[in-house]
């Protein structure tokens, strides 16, 4: 994001300021001038007049993959049917929330996060375009994510994406639920 706006790392001080409420508190207290933060805190900053959304990370690095469900080797090997049922249910709920129960979801989530429904609606609507309707991880995005992580020194050069993930269960969930790859539409 800095590079895309002509700012070098030498022009800023990078601070590990936590996440969620902690990162939001560093912004509202003036401890930091800017932060990368998840919603609803970005929307909350605008609503409270303590900050402005300057950009979304995925607009700068759209191939960076962040949405991940992780399972242990044990459950994959010993209880794959349980994992499959979980993923089927997860993606079924995902689709129903997005397409049938959106307002109820906003009400529930606002209560869980202790923010107003207006703030939560803005937070979710600001990000709804990146809610993937297809659970299968595109291999090229995984490769690109690994490249980014190596480029910025967050991942050892010897680490490869191959063998670190599986689409087996996501493919079965997509088939079971009738979800189609948006790239094929």
Label the predicted regions:
Residues 1, 44, 108-109, 148, ...:
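Residues within well-ordered alpha helices
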Residues 147-185:
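Conserved C-terminal helix/tail region of periplasmic/extracytoplasmic solute-binding proteins
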Residues 77-157:
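Secondary-structure end/capping motifs
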Residues 21-111:
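Pocket-lining segment of extracytoplasmic ligand-binding domains
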Residues 1-13, 22, 77-81:
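Hinge/capping helix and adjacent helix->loop/strand transition within the periplasmic-binding protein
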Residues 47-49, 66-68, 130-132, 169-173:
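Short secondary-structure transition/capping segments
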Residues 5, 48, 113, 152-153, ...:
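Residues at alpha-helix termini
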Residues 3-17, 31-33, 117-118, 155-161:
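A local structural motif
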């Amino acid at each position: 994001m800095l590079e895309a706006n002509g700012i070098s790392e030498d022009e800023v001080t990078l601070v590990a300021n936590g996440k969620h409420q902690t990162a939001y508190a560093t912004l509202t207290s003036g401890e930091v001038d800017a932060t990368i933060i998840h919603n609803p805190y970005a929307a909350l900053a605008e609503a409270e007049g303590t900050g402005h959304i300057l950009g979304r990370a995925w607009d700068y690095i759209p191939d960076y993959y962040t949405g991940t469900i992780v399972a242990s080797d044990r459950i994959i090997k010993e209880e794959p049917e349980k994992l499959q049922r979980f993923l089927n249910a997860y993606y079924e709920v995902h689709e129903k929330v997005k397409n049938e129960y959106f307002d109820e979801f906003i009400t529930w989530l606002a209560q869980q996060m202790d923010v107003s429904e207006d703030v939560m609606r803005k937070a979710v609507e600001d990000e709804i375009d990146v809610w993937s309707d297809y659970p299968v991880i595109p291999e090229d995005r995984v490769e690109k994510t690994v490249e980014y992580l190596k480029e910025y020194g967050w991942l050892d050069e010897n680490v490869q994406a191959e063998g670190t993930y599986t689409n087996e269960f996501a493919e079965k969930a997509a088939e079971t639920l009738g979800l189609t790859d948006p790239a094929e539409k």
